[in-house]
Amino acid sequence: MGYYLTWLTISRKKEICLNNIKKTKEGHLETTLRGKEVLSIPTLNKGVAFSLEERQELGLEGLLPPTVLSLDQQAQRAYEQFQAQPDRLRQNVYLSDLANRNEVLFYKLLKNHLREMLPVVYTPTVGEAIQEYSHEYRRPQGIYLSIDNIDGIEKAFENLHATAGDIDLIVATDSESILGIGDWGVGGINIAIGKLAVYTAAAGIDPSRVIPVVLDVGTNNEKLLNDPLYIGNKHERVQGERYEAFIDAYVKAALKFFPKALLHWEDLGNKNARNIMKKYNHEILTFNDDIQGTGAITLAGVLAAMKKTGASIKDQRVVIFGAGSAGIGIADQIRDTMVLAGLSEEEANKRFYTLDYRGLLTEDIEGILDFQKPYLRNADEVKDWKRDEKGQIPFDEVVRQAKPTILIGTSGVSGAFTEEIVKEMASHVDRPVIMPMSNPTHLAEAVPEDLFKWTDGKVLIATGSPFDNVEYNGVSYEIGQSNNAFAFPGLGLGSIVAEARIITPAMFAATADAIAEMVDLETPGAGLLPSIDKLQEVSIQVAIAVAEAAIKDGVANRQPEDVKQAVLDAMWTPEYKKVIAK
């Protein structure tokens, strides 16, 4: 038998849970707890679904209404309660409370209504929950690590009372760049919790084997610093050597206690995200979802477009409008796939044109960041290109001269893909691939309806934000959303199943290709990315492909004979276990 753990609530209840609940070989839960204590543990509590026999053995008689309901009946009632909430923030709070009251029921409800509830537990509503975190705070969830107490990091992990094999996945954020809303300090724990909920709903990652972590290094958000109810560190955000030492202490402690765990980084600032990737990506099992996850799902859209047009990835010319971490992360993954298709890395780099607030990035521009350097254009190559009053090569001139086949926006500049620019691109490409990736919706570089109109319906689109179908010339076009939820759950599950030591470029490419393979290429109007209704199906295929790629790359410590079965066996499902009184 082994301990059965929950990481949604770290409190005194945790110690009760750890000391008094065990999972039997048959999959039952065995406990010494009785009465109200049983009802207080979210992994143990079934509410009115406890059988009459369980109620007698566990001391629950008289503590519950007499009727026994099934999990399905409970889920029906919970859905009615969810629908009765006045807005999405209240729905988020309701689901959070449910998760901390009855974990199985929460995931059953989420699985039953994934399309409707994913935007509530994850982006965009989780952004509202993060902003209101200190005012909506009810109970601790996860691990809170403070830069002002580096020496306490190991103690925090020790306080979980978990063994080395108990944890598969840790999602951590320093909250500097939360979604599209910026720096929100300790409230960023909610993005880690939301991410883990998606891991479980999409890929069946066991919720008892994960930990959400917030790395509290302070905040530069004046609203939080001036808020008397703010519960995070009330000082400006720490950077530099002290920040790096804090991150290093976290990584060392996490892997000391849980050496096989996948470390997922979420919503770090650009500079820190890149530095952490550079330091750890080739040493441990880790990835940054904002950079590498976004790159994988965008690459999936590109590969699906190639399948639709019959074109080769290595022949594409790509303009990236927004050369920050996300934009360059996308470029890196497309570039790596071009290399796998036969180009040299130098040849592949030359297929890209990257822009930021300085216009086209060229070798003679000062202040270029290291991660941007592979894609700089030679100054002599563009010496005759038109420049604006600042001496910069503007976006419209890049499109005119480079004649891109793929246009990707990660700028957060609403409406940047103007009619003039889009029509210029469409004039030299049979099927322009245009991907306005910025989110939320009001920051998108273009709206799909305009893109169809400006290209006479030739465009192939994927977006970063959700958009309704577009009706054009009698066809309803589904707009595929480049939602990282299609990528990171399966990537994580596949890495865990293979016990991968690191995540290789081929594993990211396998993620993208598996997603692209799930796209409907035959139905008129089908999107470049799968429907969210296929999220679990996609995640399973991604996990299989990732595990196989890890084995092929020689980075897997486990090589199951039947990878598909190993993936399916590893998936947790929201079903009540029999609870036995010990």
Curated annotation (Swiss-Prot):
PROSITE patterns xrefs: MALIC_ENZYMES (PS00331)
EC annotation from Swiss-Prot or TrEMBL: 1.1.1.38
Active site residues according to the UniProt entry: Y122, K195
Binding note for cofactor: Divalent metal cations.
Domain of life, per lineage: Bacteria
Function: Catalyzes the decarboxylation of malate to pyruvate. Can use NAD and NADP, but with a strong preference for NAD. Can also catalyze the decarboxylation of oxaloacetate. Involved in keeping the ATP levels high.
Full protein name: NAD-dependent malic enzyme 2
Record organism: Bacillus subtilis (strain 168)
Organismal lineage: Bacteria, Bacillati, Bacillota, Bacilli, Bacillales
